[in-house]
């Protein structure tokens, strides 16, 4: 279905810089997210008919659309307000009508969207694409989701003849840095199950995520003059290289897919005297996840034993877990979304998320929360784009879910 206000709503959201900040200790991590919630989203939520709209200390903006029919479930929809760690100031979207399959120039920059480099463009011939101007990201992750949820609510309020169950809407902060759901209030949200609207292409329906951990490693060296260094110098950077060299070369993001896990070196910095490395660890299987963490610890222990001192100091922190374990207990939310997509002639793409969503943590709080497509492609950078037609289909799915009767 065509929704007249969807595009303008989305464009309005994208132009607000809501980039999160991992170095910040506040919640939300940036004031711009608070401003976006309170000055743009909250008034709009009230104006389209949501009730009990309130902003919580955890950074979530929540509202309710009461049921106007007899339905068995209260259902929530969640999207995040922040955008990824890429320039988000001065977002100036381009609209490409009736995409013809050719190269898309991104504003006045030298950057282009070339189907040879991005073959996913070929899935959108004849559609309306929204791209960046090459200087920023677009913010489709996850302002597409916000716009789709708001548009669905707006449509239902304007069409009271369409019966639906009780709907709760939640827009939260800091998903991109993994903190958004840490303080999510399940009791306040008060639904039977929920969906994050934070996926990619048409049809994505996901209830499996990585289990995730972060590893921080300090390497303690000993710096002496290189001319007299024999049997005295301990080069911290070399220790870091030695550590990394003992990890399986095939277990890296660029060499894995599907259900394969990995170790990912995010950063390495230092001097001869001291170095620091940051890793993330990812796997879908619980035992493999534990084994990966244990393997890193064994490398550190072996190196320290060889060095005769605690020169490799490893700390590992769990970040989130595969929500499959929770959702598998009751697949109602997945089966419902799958059925609705099929009724809409959308082929469900049920694959694991090689990442995480707020739904990962929220599911482990007792609220099953799988992920629905929102439409974004090439997310987190200047090559990001989204199809308006896919966004419209996402609105169709949201409406279909809350109106579905067995």
UniProtKB/Swiss-Prot annotation:
Residues binding Zn(2+) 2 are 141, 176, 380
Q: Name one GO cellular component term.
A: cytosol
Q: What is its EC number?
A: 3.4.11.4
The cross-references to SUPFAM superfamilies, in alphabetical order and at most eight, read: Bacterial exopeptidase dimerisation domain, Zn-dependent exopeptidases
Indicate where this protein is primarily found. cytoplasm
Cofactors, names only: Zn(2+)
InterPro entries membership: ArgE/DapE_CS (IPR001261), Bact_exopeptidase_dim_dom (IPR036264), Peptidase_M20 (IPR002933), Peptidase_M20_dimer (IPR011650), Peptidase_M20B (IPR010161)
Which residues carry out catalysis? Answer: 82, 175 (proton acceptor)
> At which positions is Zn(2+) 1 bound?
80, 141, 198
Cellular location of this protein?
Answer: Cytoplasm
Keywords from the named record: Aminopeptidase, Cytoplasm, Hydrolase, Metal-binding, Metalloprotease, Protease, Zinc
The record describes how the cofactor is bound as: Binds 2 Zn(2+) ions per subunit.
Per the record, what are the reactions this protein catalyses? Answer: Release of the N-terminal residue from a tripeptide
- Similarity comment: Belongs to the peptidase M20B family.
* Primary role: Cleaves the N-terminal amino acid of tripeptides.
Q: What is this protein called?
A: Peptidase T
- Annotated source species: Streptococcus mutans serotype c (strain ATCC 700610 / UA159)
List the lineage, top down: Bacteria, Bacillati, Bacillota, Bacilli, Lactobacillales
């Amino acid at each position: 279905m065509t929704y007249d206000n969807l595009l303008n709503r989305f464009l309005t959201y994208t132009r607000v810089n809501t980039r999160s900040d991992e170095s910040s200790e506040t919640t939300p991590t940036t004031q711009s997210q608070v401003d976006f919630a309170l000055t743009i989203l909250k008034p709009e939520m009230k104006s389209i008919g949501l009730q009990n709209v309130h902003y919580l200390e955890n950074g979530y903006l929540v509202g309710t659309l009461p049921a106007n029919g007899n339905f068995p479930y209260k259902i929530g929809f969640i999207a995040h307000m922040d955008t990824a760690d890429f320039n988000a100031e001065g977002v100036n979207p381009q609209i490409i009508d009736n995409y013809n399959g050719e190269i898309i120039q991104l504003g006045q920059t030298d950057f282009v969207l070339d189907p040879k480099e991005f073959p996913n463009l070929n899935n959108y011939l004849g559609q309306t694409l929204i791209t960046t101007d090459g200087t920023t990201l677009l913010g489709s992750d996850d302002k597409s989701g916000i716009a789709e949820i708001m548009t669905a609510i707006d449509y239902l309020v304007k069409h009271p003849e369409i019966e639906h169950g009780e709907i709760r809407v939640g827009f939260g902060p800091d998903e991109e840095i993994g903190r958004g759901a840490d303080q999510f209030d399940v009791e306040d949200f008060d639904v039977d199950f929920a969906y994050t609207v934070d996926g990619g292409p048409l049809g994505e329906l996901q209830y499996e995520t990585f289990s995730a951990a972060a590893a921080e490693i300090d390497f303690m060296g000993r710096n002496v003059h290189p001319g007299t260094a024999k049997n005295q110098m301990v080069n911290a950077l070399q220790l870091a290289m030695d550590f990394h060299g003992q990890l399986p070369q095939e277990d890296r993001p660029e060499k894995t897919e599907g259900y394969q896990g990995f170790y990912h070196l995010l950063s390495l910095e230092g001097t001869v005297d001291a170095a620091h490395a940051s890793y993330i660890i990812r796997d879908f299987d619980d035992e493999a996840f534990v084994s990966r963490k244990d393997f890193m610890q064994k490398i550190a222990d072996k190196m320290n034993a060889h060095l005769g001192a605690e020169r490799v100091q490893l700390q590992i922190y769990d970040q989130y877990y595969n929500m499959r374990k929770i959702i598998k207990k009751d697949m109602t939310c997945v089966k419902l979304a799958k059925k609705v997509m099929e009724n809409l002639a959308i082929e469900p793409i049920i694959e694991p998320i090689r990442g995480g969503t707020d739904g990962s943590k929220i599911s482990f709080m007792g609220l099953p929360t799988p992920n629905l497509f929102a439409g974004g492609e090439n997310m987190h950078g200047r090559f990001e784009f989204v199809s308006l037609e896919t966004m419209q289909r996402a609105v169709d799915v949201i409406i279909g879910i809350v109106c579905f009767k067995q």
